[in-house]
Regions:
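A surface-exposed partner-binding patch
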Residues: 1-92, 123, 138-208
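Compact, glycine/acidic-enriched structural inserts
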Residues: 91-128
Length: 208
């Protein structure tokens, strides 16, 4: 049986650009919290909002925005003009991640392994999704993130408290919100202009 997930819009408070600026500024001013976010969630907050990398004019975007962070591969997290957050991968994949900056941090803190949950088959029923979550959490829990041996769960609690977001028990709910946001329209489309002048349009969906 395939589950159907209804998209629910967040309140304006969480789409408010002022809230986004507040949480980003907090991270810029708290190097310890920012380092934990970088180490555990692979989100390196930029010193300021910047134009997304257009690869020397080869990339264009159907929704404008500013990059606020990068991961270790050079992929960018972009706060779009409509208040949503999208991902532009260094290997060409791109799409919306979250309906607001709060939803974005809720996702990466609760699910630092989100990038391993892009198989759309996982979302056909909750059993598959929960099984994948258990597997990934077991892998993550084996890792130590601090010199003193601090566990993933401990760092997640610190990040959630520092960012003022909820650390949830049912991670599947967070991933379902991610899936809903990533599949709704209008999609975030990245177009690559080839050297011969032709264009290649992305699907606007991270899931495959």
């Amino acid at each position: 049986m395939e589950y159907k997930f209804d998209f629910v819009t967040k309140s304006n408070r969480y789409n408010n650009k002022y809230f986004a600026m507040d949480i980003l500024e907090k991270l810029r001013n708290d190097s310890e919290l920012a380092e934990k976010l970088k180490t555990v969630c692979d989100v390196d907050i930029l010193d300021e909002l910047k134009e997304p990398d257009d690869y020397d004019g080869h990339l264009t975007f159907n929704i404008q925005g500013k990059a606020f962070g990068r991961d270790a591969s050079g992929s960018e997290y972009i706060l779009l003009d409509d208040g949503t957050v999208s991902y532009v991968g260094s290997e060409g994949q791109s799409g919306r991640m979250a309906e607001s900056i709060e939803d974005f941090f809720e996702l990466v803190v609760n699910c630092p392994y989100w990038i391993d949950c892009l198989n759309k088959e996982l979302y056909k029923n909750t059993g598959k999704l929960n099984k994948k979550i258990i597997e990934l959490e077991e892998e993550c829990l084996e890792e130590e993130y601090e010199e003193d041996g601090t566990s993933l769960k401990e760092v997640q609690r610190e990040l959630a408290a520092g960012l003022g977001i909820e650390l949830v028990e049912n991670v599947a709910d967070i991933l379902i919100k991610f899936y809903e946001s990533g599949n709704r329209k209008p999609r975030f489309i990245v177009t690559f202009k080839e050297n011969d002048g032709s264009n290649t349009h992305g699907s606007g969906i991270l899931f495959n």
